Amino acid sequence: KSSAGAAERLPVARVANIGETIRRLKEQGVFVYCADMDGVPLRKNNLTGPIALVLGSEGSGVSQLVKKLCDGVVRLDMAAQGTGVDSYNVSVAAGIILYEIQSQRAAQNA
């Protein structure tokens, strides 16, 4: 229970039609980001407003169609480049991105 503490307060969704979901979120004023190795470095994005985050599968990532529907694409730089490891697993990537969102929002409210 304690390891999933934030899950009780963080809206997480698995949807049948991601394209339609992205369109609806954008209509409601939500800025939709996806994570991809070809994106803008995470810290260069303003993550303080209402946002949704799209994470792809560990094998194939986010599809090109979904990337085109998103408002922005974020990239997580690897600390240990040249080690043969070129990406984080999806749960680690989510944790890093959520931490940056929280950090930016805390700094904005300080």
Stretches with model-predicted labels:
Residues 1-44:
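RNA substrate-binding interface of SAM-dependent RNA methyltransferases
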